[in-house]
Regions:
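Interdomain hinge/lid region at the active-site interface
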Residues: 212, 216-275
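Active-site-proximal catalytic alpha-helix in oxidoreductases
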Residues: 133-136, 157, 161-193, 205-216
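Rossmann-fold dinucleotide-binding core
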Residues: 3, 8, 94-173
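NAD(P)+-binding Rossmann beta1-loop-alpha1 motif at the extreme N-terminus of oxidoreductases
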Residues: 1-63, 87, 158, 192
């Protein structure tokens, strides 16, 4: 099956690579020359033209960063027209659920299917086909896209119509970022009380407080694999802040609880921003 994938960043490129290794004929597309050059998977094609990529494929994956980028890419429906009747769009970007629903309705007028698929697990999990997928879309579209999902995911949850994939992904990110922020803050309190950082983390991890966030959050923004570089830290900050702002627009059943969650997220964002400033000052 011929598929296109637009957006070859830290998540898009690994997904596209996994698809190629799973037998799909993949054309990777990105308007950034450095991203396109880095996509060197054997047996794939490369393109800097999203419209041409759409014309040459049956399924089109999208993993751009922001709502504005996604709307510019769709170009009022021109992208769907290029893909053609019977094509299907698989949206892996994390964007506004309302925008996903709006674009799905627009795609339908061109005879194009549309599913929104939030992913969790990161690039390494994508390469291994071990992502968790949060899927929103009509049953028929989801069924058609299932070979794609099975290639990249270990867990595939079809949660309802288009928009549900985005909402579930935002909930996942809200929990994750809040947990990171809370765990990092707790360790800071412990250190202020005079505990050894590593010793108290090990002790807490042996009790009911244990979590993935507690294990990794205190060192989350320390230099490792280039993440300690100022530009990398600010890139992480911008990405997480975008997701937190999208979460602020979710309708809360309990405004007080939502504010508490968002406050924990803000702790993590402030921590990353501070680390970026410290890294910049130490250059």
């Amino acid at each position: 099956m011929k598929v296109g994938f637009i957006g070859l960043g830290s998540m898009g490129a690994p997904i596209a690579r996994r698809l190629a290794r799973s037998g799909f004929e993949v054309t990777g597309c990105d308007i950034a020359p450095e991203m396109l050059e880095a996509f060197d998977e054997a047996g794939t094609k490369r393109s800097a033209d999203p419209m041409e990529t759409a014309r040459q494929t049956d399924m089109l994956g999208i993993c751009v960063r922001t709502d504005a980028q996604l709307e510019a890419l769709v170009d009022g429906g021109a992208l769907f027209e290029a893909l053609g009747k019977g094509g299907i769009v698989i949206l892996h970007s994390t964007v506004s659920p309302d925008l996903a629903r709006k674009l799905a309705a627009l795609a339908k007028t061109y005879g194009v299917g549309f599913v929104d698929v939030g992913v969790s697990g990161g690039g390494p999990a994508a390469i291994e086909g071990q992502l968790s997928l949060f899927v929103g879309g009509e049953d028929g579209d989801v069924e058609r896209a299932m070979p794609w999902f099975e290639a990249i995911g270990k867990s595939i949850a079809h949660l309802g119509p288009v928009g549900r994939g985005q909402e579930a992904k935002l909930l996942n990110n809200l929990i994750s970022i809040a947990n990171y922020g809370m765990s990092a803050a707790i360790v800071d309190v412990a250190v202020a009380l005079g505990f050894d950082r590593e010793q108290i983390i090990a002790a807490l991890m042996a009790g009911s407080a244990q979590s993935f966030a507690l294990k990794v959050a205190p060192g989350f923004v320390r230099p490792r694999s280039g993440l300690g570089a100022p530009s990398s830290l600010m890139g992480l900050y911008d990405l997480l802040k975008k997701d937190v702002e999208l979460c602020r627009n979710l309708p809360p059943s309990d405004p007080v609880a939502m504010e508490a969650l968002l406050a924990s997220c803000d702790v993590m964002l402030a921590r990353i921003k501070r680390a970026a400033a410290e890294a910049e000052a130490s250059k």
